[in-house]
Amino acid sequence: MSSSLCVLPWMHLATHPNGGASLCCRSNHNDAISWARKNDNLVLLDNDSLNDIVNSDKFVNVRQAMLDGKRPVECEGCWRDEDNGIESKRQYENRRWSHIIKYLEKTA
């Protein structure tokens, strides 16, 4: 398993009042950096499907970065916690969903 993998970008999203969707509640929301995007345009719940969101450029790129062992900037909240010895949401969710991680490693 990649040391930076998190199950959430495969099976979860956080929604926002304006219709935007991001990777999770702990992801970096500065300038909507973690929000679903396709061709640099926000993918919004009122215009797009859930499939469009979870397969948006942003979600796919973050999943691939995790599979490649990179630490996406969108997930800096978890990296900061882990670097300070605090259990992150990523670590908690990976433990909670450990039975599906082997399936995630096959696809971004």
Summary of predicted features, one role per range:
Residues 10-24, 102-108:
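N-terminal pre-triad scaffold of radical SAM enzymes
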